[in-house]
Amino acid sequence: MPSIINASVPGSEANTSEINYMSDDPAQTANEKIYPKDKGYAWVIMIACFFNLGFSLGAVNSIGVFQTHYLKVMFATVPAEMIAWISTASITTTLSCGIFANMIASRLGIRNTAMLGSLIGCLGLLLASFSTKIWQLVLTQGVIFGFGSSILINISLSVLPQWFDKHRSFAMGLIASGGGFGALFLIPIITKMLEVSSFAWAIRVLLIVYALIAGISSFLVKPRIPNTGTTISFDYKVLSDPTIILLSLIGGFIQIGTSIAILYFPASIIDLGYNPTLATNLIMVFSVFSACSRLTSGYLTKKINAVNILIFANFVTSIIFMALWYNSKTMGTSLTFYILFGIFGAPYFAVQPIIVSANYKYEQISSINGVVFLIMGLAILIAVPSIGKVFQTLGNRKDYNQIITIAALSFFIATIFSIFLRYSLLKKQVTSNRNKNSN
């Protein structure tokens, strides 16, 4: 049976070359050059989108370093469920607010919107560097920085498919790996600054790096097809699409399980008797394997059905949580879990945008990604504070088994929904082929 990801759907990647989805900067005109796909400036777009995701999602993936600092140093006497609101706000806003990117870009243009996102992100980090209370960090590091990053992420995921056809799977896999490589770059910087200086200067150094990289990358982003004055609003039809609903549910449950590992694994290493520096440095190990997994998953979708990758990866992840991290008392077992989690827990973040770009019209991509990420963000909003409460009351801030069980169940539920997704896409493909034959 042919792979669903390569199925030809009317209006999908094979038929989007002349769709003007988001307007470019107002200064551009319809007389400007239309760039070719898969070559030339397309590679500049890919690199720019890679860095946008790298330093937006990379900063979010580095939240585990700050979470450990909050739990063990900065807010050591504050209940864990209160501290969890910082990471909750950061992850939730970063994921969910991208739904506004389409509406902003239709008025300001892609480049201006991307630059606005990077500017808002910089403002959030600047204000966070002066914050000393939890509510201040929720607002600055969480909401303001998260909103700016969400705009960059949505723009990058939505504009790239317009530039690639033949090499789309590779390009999407590469930018999806950006968050892992970004975290690999940022984590040692943040960790070192927390050691030798202060929290405030750790944030300020992050601000300098983010402003430089995201600012340049945002300026380089533009649509392949020049502005013709078209304004595209949110496509509400995607809200009732079974495939989109399933993708959103899968993402939501995966995000719950992922957040537990990202936020609590470093702290669990400290509780085994190791120092905080080693614990946070292990996040880099995770980031390497996660980034490579996302890049590889994107490439594998050309050979293996994308949903089959999801089913297998989600099921394996649910097993390793219980087999390796649950009740772990040794560094070897815990590290093995973290490495395998980086490999098998990451494919969704690479194959989800590939599935969307292969099965839907280009002008729907931003709306679909916005909905999927919104559900993922809402899942974090509901789950992370609850997980913090479980860790505080049932685990007494020392026992991780209860939240590990929650993570394992989340990935198992995602496995079930992934099976439903496969049948949904099969049905979609059969319907599409039937319509073609009838015409």
What is each model feature region?
Residues 55, 59-70, 187, 241-301, ...:
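Extracytoplasmic gate region of multi-pass secondary transporters
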Residues 50, 54, 124-125, 135-151, ...:
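Hydrophobic core of transmembrane alpha-helices in multi-pass small-molecule transporters
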Residues 359-397, 407:
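A late C-terminal transmembrane helix in Major Facilitator Superfamily
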Residues 119-132, 218, 315-329:
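C-terminal ends and interior cores of transmembrane alpha-helices
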Residues 2-57, 220-237:
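Cytosolic juxtamembrane N-terminal segment immediately preceding the first transmembrane helix
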Residues 70, 142, 149-164, 171-172, ...:
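Intracellular juxtamembrane helix-capping segments at the cytosolic ends
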Residues 97-110, 293-306, 391-392:
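Helix-to-loop junctions at the C-terminal end of transmembrane segments
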Residues 272-274, 278, 286-290, 294, ...:
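C-terminal transmembrane helical hairpin of 12-TM major facilitator-type secondary transporters
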